[in-house]
Every structure is written in structure tokens, then in C-alpha cells.
Amino acid sequence: MKKHINIKFGELFLKGKNKKEFIKALFKNVNKALSDFEFKLLDKHSMFTLEYCSEDENEIIHILKMIPGIHHFFLCLEAKTDIKEIAKVANGFDKKYKTFKIEVKRRYKEFLDQTEIKKEVATYILKNNEIKVDVHNPELTINIEIYDENKSYVWFDKILGVGGLPIGVNGRCLSLLSGGIDSPVASFLLQKRGQQVDYLTFITDDVTEITLNKLKSLIKQITLNYKIYKPRFFIVDFTKVQHELIHMSNEKYRITLMRRSFYRIAQQLAIKYKMNSLICGDSLGQVASQTIESINTISQVCDKMEIFRPLLTFDKVEIIEIAKQIGTYEISISEHEDVCSMFAPKHPITKPKLSIALALENELELLKSLEDRAVANVQIIKE
């Protein structure tokens, strides 16, 4: 008895004329993501069917749950198109269930009709189990698909994927990766909307190899071990810019000016290396630099592209839950040096004014040239 997984697309069917291109991209991504296994992936228009070795099942399920574009999938058992064979396979459900119903789909019409199939299979199951039929609110739904004259499929449980769009259909963007909990989740959510995500981090002399390795581990986790695409990791030495920022006359604006500098540098890199937007992990009101006034003052420096903030309305509990689901949480909470926390004043401004931020930047004669030099000297790691 062979094992299959039927993969459903969800949102891709809303794409009209572009639907074929989106499905083609997802087909390619699934093949790449599973390249370490022996499998056969078939495009059956309304779904993909994956034939696989049973010993790889747990790992394959874990990967499929993380591939953007997959709405849900079923673990299917294959049976001959014979009603006795189908009934025996359908009887292989977990015996913990007390009620059930049967759903039937017939691609191959030259067989019993739906009512006859349901009656025969239900009779067999009721005879061999202590279970009742409940067509309105069953604990278990047994799905049967009569595929052709030779084979049929039976499945029991629907496994949810992450949904969204296939990676790569919406271009590339640049994520400002700090190593905390939020920015990896924000990166994953933009990846889920079809973006290939490249990563940018800022370091100073205090940042160690341990921190850089932590960031690389986060990127590897988000991108499914680099199977679907190879992200670029941009590392900017921020030391000299940070030393210049220390000379401002109002230290309460230190984080505001530092983040404005981050975004100026990020925008330059995104333009130079052909990315279409920036990503950050801001959550409205979470810290001083994420009040609406701070966000407005900081964002003003990005006049050539959008800054996406997918976590803007999420609270910390929600963000942590997603981080755990995608496997970044345990990596994020390990110790690391963070440029922002090391540079933060005791009492940062929570409602900065743009006019004051601009005036403070005008005090720093070397700021622009140091930012330009940081861009020119960026280190790029390609996995």
C-alpha cells in the first residue's frame, strides 16, 4: 500500500490569469524544499500529489507545513478501485474517535455512485468498530476519492500549512535583522507573501562571532535550510557612525537618530542590490522607538521604497507564538549583543519631533560621509 500526500493551494486559485505561474512557482519550491528525500511530485491542476517513502514522513510533513503557498494537505492511503479494498483502507483510522461521517469525490464516474460507496464503507466500519455515524458534527471525517479505474485515495486528517503565496513571486526585499524575537517573525511573514528576503544587520566592535552565528542560524531556519532560495546576508560595520552619533547635543534622541541612520543605509543597499522594499519587526507602542511619533520621524528618511511592518498590530504574546511555530524562538532568546540596547540612553524620547531630529543631524558634519562609507564597505555573505 503506497502513501501519498495531496497538497492544496488555497489562495492561489484567486489569481486569475496568473494562477498558472503561481502554481508553477509553488511546484518548483516544493521540489527544492524536499530535495534531500526520494519522492515524486505530480501536478494534478487542483492539487499536487506527493508520493514518498513512509520512513521520511515526519520530516516531510514538517517541511510542507512551512512552505508558503500551501494552504493544507492530506496524508492519503492508496487503494484499488474496489469497494471491499476501499472499505478496508478506510477502516485504518485512529480508534479514539466515537463518531464519523464519509465524504466521497468521484473523478472516475464508471464506478458506484456516492450513496452506494458511503453505504458500503459505513456498513463495514460500523460492523468492525464501536463508533456511530454523525453527519452534522463528526469527530472524524473519512474522505474517499475515486481517482480512476485502478486507484482510489482515502484520507482522514487535514494538516494546515502556512498559506500565503509561493516564495519568489513578489521579488526581493531587505529585512533589518536584530537577533531578537520580532524581526525573524516579520521576515517570515513577508516571505509568506511571496518575497525572497535578504538580511541586514549592524555590528560594532563589541559584536562577537557568537552573535553573527546566531543570526545565520535564524536566517537558515526562516529560509528552510536555504533549500528554496539563497538569501544574502549584509553586515554593516556601524562603529564609526555610532561614535559620530554620540556627539549629538540631545542624548534622548540617540535611538531615533540611530534608527534613521539604519534606514538610510538600508535603503541605499536595497537600491544598489535591486531589492524592492524594507522589512522591520516594529510593533506599535512596544518600545520607545515604536510609538507612532517615533515611527513617523524614523520612516521619513525612506523616500524611495516602502517599509513593511507586518507585526505592527501584534502583541508580544502573538509574536512569540508565531516564533515558536516557525522554530525561531529558541534561537532568538539565546544571548547576543544588540547595537540598539548597547547604545540606548536611560530615558529615550517617545514622541520625537522631525524638526528636532533634522537639527540634531545637522550638528553631525561627518554623519553622511560615514554612512556612505559603511555602505561601500558592507560585507555580503552568500550561503
UniProtKB/Swiss-Prot annotation:
Metabolic or biological pathway: Cofactor biosynthesis; thiamine diphosphate biosynthesis
Keywords for this protein: ATP-binding, Cytoplasm, Nucleotide-binding, RNA-binding, Thiamine biosynthesis, Transferase, tRNA-binding
Localisation: Cytoplasm
Any GO BP annotation: tRNA 4-thiouridine biosynthesis
Family matches, as InterPro entries: Rossmann-like_a/b/a_fold, ThiI_AANH, ThiI_fer, ThiI_N, THUMP_dom, THUMP_ThiI, tRNA_STrfase, tRNA_sulfurtransferase_ThiI
EC class: transferase
An example Gene Ontology CC term for this record: cytosol
GO molecular function ontology, one term from the record: CCA tRNA nucleotidyltransferase activity
Pfam families, per the entry: ThiI (PF02568), ThiI_fer (PF22025), THUMP (PF02926)
Matching HAMAP family: ThiI
Protein function: Catalyzes the ATP-dependent transfer of a sulfur to tRNA to produce 4-thiouridine in position 8 of tRNAs, which functions as a near-UV photosensor. Also catalyzes the transfer of sulfur to the sulfur carrier protein ThiS, forming ThiS-thiocarboxylate. This is a step in the synthesis of thiazole, in the thiamine biosynthesis pathway. The sulfur is donated as persulfide by IscS.
Protein name: Probable tRNA sulfurtransferase
Protein species of origin: Malacoplasma penetrans (strain HF-2)
